[in-house]
């Protein structure tokens, strides 16, 4: 019985002690809470100023002291630093600002949780400064007054048939607008270390080595210089490849690849100068067995410079690897020898005679009357080609109109045709009663030539 009473008394004592501890803790918690009615909670920061456990009534003094000691450390990309003090910019405490909102937010009964969770507040215009003094101080910053290295985009370098990426240059040029904006933000928030790089105060290259556009541009450059165009000129060839193409390429500020059209046109122009044969000197074995030196005329190869320039640009853009002939305005029948081939009309002005050969065989020959040199109407010399042929044409000129059955022009309005008004051909008629420049032929001769000739057939006109 005695043991039972002792156990009951012990349990009552334990409960009483627990109640004492609990109410003591509650009482202590309430007492501490009463303290925080007029004090800031643990880990409280306002505009960068630590006011933990500080009395509300002392806030003005705390802030004023902070401002007197305030400075902001500016760290450059290079690691160099400089300091702006609050005094230099006329920094002051705006004592007209009310802290009532913060006091209301901070529940004094939540002081325990503030031990584990910080509270940071920002009050607009808590710190004020002289904007003019700030501008003056910014203008004096070393980082704005040393030798400037401008940022530069990534670049590309041609090496052995392809392009390498040359890394961009960050430089040290500061954007004054962003610098001022960052300073105002940091000063207003009471922050004391400004890293210019982290706050993006530097001018930056638009494109870096890791930009998607950079990779795209490199691939495009490599594609362009992979082109290989081999031009055929009979037995001769001209090859255009990366060694030349890369000199025509440029990358602009937006990393767009530009092909210099003028360079391409100049290349085609040089091909034209080298391989065009219109009007060149030619040797020709005449029907009388003599060697005639021919020069002038409209016959020969002639590259279409505009068309080939455009075609070549497209080949480069597609990275083509091809063999081709250039685009031509006109072609000769051959690239070999005198290029005349074995189908042609031969006109000997001295002998006033015409021969027509087809596939190496003479089809017809006969006397003709050419232009009167004594009246300024000499028939043109050189090598030409039949432009077209027409039956029943009417030829007109100053003071004449003539109807002919067979008309085969080879130089403007100069051509070969029948002349029904003539009864004699050959000899020296052309010196007295020659044509206005055309080659007059007997009907049979004109007819046979007309029936066997094709457009583009060479016409050789020479004097012995």
Predicted regions and their residues:
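Surface-exposed, secretory/extracytoplasmic low-complexity segments enriched in Ser/Thr/Asn/Gly/Pro
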Residues: 2-402, 406, 453-455, 460-464
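Active-site scaffold segments
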Residues: 407-461
């Amino acid at each position: 019985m005695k043991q039972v009473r002792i156990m009951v008394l012990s349990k009552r004592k334990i409960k009483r002690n627990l109640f004492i501890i609990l109410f003591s803790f509650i009482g202590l918690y309430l007492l501490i809470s009463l303290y925080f009615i007029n004090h800031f909670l643990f880990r409280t920061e306002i505009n960068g100023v630590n006011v933990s456990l500080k009395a509300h009534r002392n806030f003005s003094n705390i802030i004023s002291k902070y401002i007197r000691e305030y400075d902001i450390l500016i760290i450059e990309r290079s690691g160099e630093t400089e300091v702006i003090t609050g005094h230099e910019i006329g920094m002051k405490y705006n004592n007209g600002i009310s802290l009532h909102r913060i006091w209301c937010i901070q529940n004094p009964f939540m002081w325990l949780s503030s031990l584990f969770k910080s509270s940071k507040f920002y009050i607009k215009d808590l710190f004020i400064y002289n904007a003019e003094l700030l501008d003056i101080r910014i203008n004096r910053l070393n980082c704005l007054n040393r030798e400037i290295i401008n940022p530069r985009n990534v670049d590309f370098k041609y090496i052995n048939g392809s392009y390498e990426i040359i890394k961009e240059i960050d430089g040290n040029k500061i954007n004054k607008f962003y610098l001022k904006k960052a300073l105002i933000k940091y000063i207003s928030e009471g922050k004391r270390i400004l890293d210019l790089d982290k706050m993006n105060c530097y001018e930056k290259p638009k494109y870096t080595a890791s930009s998607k556009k950079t990779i795209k541009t490199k691939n495009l450059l490599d594609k362009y210089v992979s082109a290989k165009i081999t031009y055929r000129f009979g037995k001769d060839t001209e090859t255009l490849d990366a060694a030349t193409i890369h000199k025509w390429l440029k990358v602009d500020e937006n990393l767009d690849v530009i092909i210099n059209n003028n360079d391409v046109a100049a290349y085609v122009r040089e091909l034209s100068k080298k391989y065009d044969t219109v009007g060149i000197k030619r040797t020709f074995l005449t029907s009388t067995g003599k060697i005639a030196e021919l020069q002038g005329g409209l016959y020969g190869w002639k590259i279409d410079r505009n068309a080939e320039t455009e075609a070549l640009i497209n080949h480069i853009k597609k990275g083509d690897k091809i063999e081709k002939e250039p685009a031509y305005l006109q072609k000769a029948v051959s690239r070999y020898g005198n290029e005349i081939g074995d189908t042609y009309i031969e006109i000997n002005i001295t002998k006033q005679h015409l021969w027509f050969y087809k596939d190496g065989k003479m089809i017809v020959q006969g006397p003709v009357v050419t232009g009167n040199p004594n009246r300024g109407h000499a028939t043109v010399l050189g090598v030409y080609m039949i432009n077209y042929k027409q039956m029943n044409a009417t030829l007109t000129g100053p003071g004449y109109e003539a109807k002919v059955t067979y008309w085969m022009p080879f130089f403007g309005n100069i051509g070969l045709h029948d002349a029904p008004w003539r009864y004699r051909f050959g000899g020296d008629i052309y010196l007295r009663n020659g044509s206005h420049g055309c080659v007059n032929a007997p009907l049979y001769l004109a007819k046979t030539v007309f029936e066997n000739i094709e457009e583009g057939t060479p016409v050789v006109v020479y004097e012995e």
